[in-house]
Amino acid sequence: MKRIFLLIATNLAVLLVASIVMSILGVNTSTMGGLLVFAAIFGFGGAFISLAISKWMAKKTMGCEVITTPRDSTERWLVETVARQAKQAGIKMPEVAIYQSSDMNAFATGPSKDNSLVAVSTGLLYGMSQDEIEGVLAHEVSHVANGDMVTLTLIQGVVNTFVIFAARVVAGIINNFVSSNDEEGEGLGMFAYMAVVFVLDMLFGILASIIVAYFSRIREYKADEGAARLAGKGKMIAALERLRQGPESTAMPAQMSAFGINGKRSMAEMMMSHPPLEKRIAALRAS
């Protein structure tokens, strides 16, 4: 109940702040053009702010410990492997970090190819062979080299804009319909209108998440292909086979899970950020 209240309160606060900002900027959201500007500013703005602080957020939320000076042979091998793969991929050396988790997982994040972070869990580091880990690292380096963080940020910005724009257009249509059938012609009223917008934001948001998940799955196949080139097809397949045999991964924060090696499994594949491991293995074997 508390989470629902916070979600509603946050949404209303965002709407209030957005309205104030648009008023200051002189943008008239009662027109389609003004509404589209409003939607684009907040749709892309939120996505790019998330991208800009992605490394900082990852370190804070996942408790990542960046390896500045390797403390043992395992950390030294980890850093050297990422450095070698980054050079092969033609990108600047990412920061390398370890985070405490029993899950066998890893992720890449960062605002650009030259400002990125590759992090692995302790569960993966001590639960896989070096060949398997090399495949995982190559997958994450490929995400960085392919510019997937920026690509998905642009996609997220587009769908955010759609959600904000469509929700308010539909809410306006509903408001006009109610107003035309109301003797006083008052329509929904401010709070009812905001409630309708909130519900529509949630509904369109579900549709948007399906679209983003679809593109995320495509990028996963591309990262697997890149990993096969950097580390060898056998190592990438071995890593995926090892993940398939292990327990289901618990969910990471959304901004990291899209670029993780192991996504959360779901009955509805269209909601998954990662294709099923069986399909990824089959795609690699067929390539």
From Swiss-Prot:
It holds the Pfam family Peptidase_M48. Keywords: Cell inner membrane, Cell membrane, Hydrolase, Membrane, Metal-binding, Metalloprotease, Protease, Transmembrane, Transmembrane helix, Zinc. Binds 1 zinc ion per subunit. Its cofactor is Zn(2+). The chain crosses the membrane at residues 4-24, 33-53, 154-174, 195-215. One of its GO terms (molecular function) is zinc ion binding. NCBIfam families: PRK05457.1. This is Protease HtpX. It comes from Shewanella baltica (strain OS185).
